[in-house]
Amino acid sequence: MQSLLHMENRYFILNKPYNMLSQFVSPYAHHRLLGDIDFQFPQGTHAIGRLDEFSEGLLILTTDKSITRRLLHPDKQHNRHYVVQVQRVMSETTLQQLRDGIGIQLKQRGDYTTMPCEVNKISRPENLAFIDKAYLDRIEHTWLEFILTEGKNRQIRKMCKVVKHNCKRLIRTKIENLNLGDLKAGQVKELKAEDFFNQLGLE
């Protein structure tokens, strides 16, 4: 049973569209923001585990300030699933490099070796949201599924760049058992606290 504090908080998932920041305010007028979504979020709502402007998919929003620490703390590993389109056909050797862990640069920490992860080739996902990048399907490319237990800033993009397969599309589909379901790009779903905590494996 969740505490009264948790019951008073609210929990949402958004299928974040391409070309939108994971925040409600920006000093630059040209950015699309979370406030542009056709949904009235309560005061104090913030995003957890942000996606960069050009990444898409599952974004958690909540008024619960404790969730960031509980979900993203380095000691609390949670599986994060992504589908990724990269340039060129990726070899099995390169896939294994990514699986084993690879050296990237982090802004605050410098050299960093990523933790072992799951990376596999997949078919083009069905029901992809439309983005005005039709040429992406015409260039030589590979679709991959990544399952990470860590979430460094722009980690997958940096990993792919190191092995010379630039990331062209990145969509987060699932965190633990919390997934997008049938949410279309730009749609929001509110979750009951009990369901939210159970699906993320949080107590």
Q: What are these language model-derived features?
A:
Residues 2-203:
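RNA pseudouridine synthases
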